[in-house]
């Protein structure tokens, strides 16, 4: 059967030979040499490959044909690879592996079948083309891509139809909510109208009963004033005389004027101002306990008060101070002083015979010894009330204990920082989520923070790194990522206000907390201002050359001064977190264990250090931020995605 099948083979090739015979082709065409290519494949993420081919020369082919071959007459294909993850391979087509045999094959074809030379040439051409282009593999890839595109198209159609249904349901639900809201708005409008009508009726009744009330109030006040005068005649006779010469009928006159104004306003149907009654009550309840007359002029007192009010740049002097004692003003009939009373009314404490020393921010300086005066706040302060003298007295004490933390919210990632501006009068909260980024999120207050309702988002021009940022006096202070630069970003005008370089800081990618890419540069704010804490080289100890440096910064230009810079004995890799209170640096020994200690303290006032060994609880065992807020006297902490505060106790 095999012998019978052999004869038809030349007949099958004859038509192809006849078709190719119409084109003249030379046997030594250069097309064959063009197809001799080396193919290289590489696999791996880090790979560099190189193929080196050494073919036989024409002289070597002639020597091999004549039987005079040498040792160096051979061809090779070498593969050279480099890289940690690399696999290389080099291959070559048959025409390139043995050029001598290729020439012998061509000569045999010329001698035995000249008509098949053209066919062999075309076969070699097609073989080289298929080998170099790898058309079958390309076809397989194209088919696979086409099938993936079809699958993707079907899934997109299904998802779009499903999302369209969700959007339609949402629009329908929002329309229903809008109708309910409109109904509630109409009800609220009716309630407001009813309340306005009732308020107008009550106002008219009060206006009708007003003429009898001031007479009684004036009489009782006159009796109280007369009784107070009778008690003080023996002690302050001369003062009473000088004070009586000035006259006291103004408060009743003002009361009558207010009653007449009340009648006019009630006739018009308007509402009373909410501040009118409290001022009148304050005047009626005043009790004169005694007077002291000084020769200092009114202008000198006013100038001294203004000068002392403007002294100091610390945030503590912007807070309303505590008020101890109760007294009346020096000139109750002064109209200018009545106008200035809601802002800051001067009170003199004369309960005892001698002047009493009261912590205050405003003192009256005259030629004779004067009692200390203080400002009366018009509304209850939101935070602790500390004056400049009280601040210095409180900072003389040291930290006695740290209470267990109070959790306020769980927000964001495991690492982050949250803070308040201690120099601000509002309760805005600022959050940096994670230890690397360029966004600062602002919340109006703690309730909005718990609800996730942010009020502002700041996109910074340069990325921050770490969790040691602070917000102070309306600016965000942070360390620029992967540099030794510190930046002050103005939050109100949204631009970089200052830029400085810490030349002696030791900056590396690894940190004492072993957070990837975290920064060792830590900002802090205490009662005295802005500070920066960073590691530097210690020339005194070669075994442990890196120590923690504490320096007070100028908030304006971020400058560092030698007289306000201290090198501590705290080593860089020996603590977890640190914070600054009243000019004393405290360091917690661990951050990833629940039971920790405040193991180190450095006092900048004396230049000495100590080991207080105070218990400190890392409740969630991953504390990435601890910062002191001098306005609230608490520590703000970020522990494994939980926002906490610690209450501090001091030894005064």
UniProtKB/Swiss-Prot annotation:
UniProt keyword annotations, A-Z: Coiled coil, Disulfide bond, Glycoprotein, Secreted, Signal
Biased segments, Low complexity type: 209-219, 352-377
Record-level GO cellular component terms: extracellular matrix; extracellular space
Tissue occurrence: In the kidney expressed only by podocytes, wherein they localize to major processes.
Entry PTM: May be cleaved at Lys-295 after secretion.
Segment forming the signal sequence: 1-27
Site feature: Cleavage: 294-295
Basic and acidic residues bias: start-end ranges: 224-234, 243-254, 340-349
Region described as Disordered: spans on this chain: 209-254, 312-407
Main location: secreted
All copies of domain Olfactomedin-like, residue ranges: 394-652
Bias (Polar residues): 326-335
Disulfide bonds: 395-582
Coiled-coil region(s): 157-183
Compartments, record wording: Secreted
One Gene Ontology MF term: extracellular matrix binding
GO BP: any one term: extracellular matrix organization
Pfam families assigned to the protein according to its UniProt record, in alphabetical order: OLF
PROSITE patterns (UniProt xref): OLF
Assembly, per entry: Homodimer. Binds to heparin and chondroitin sulfate E.
Name by which UniProt lists this protein: Olfactomedin-like protein 2A
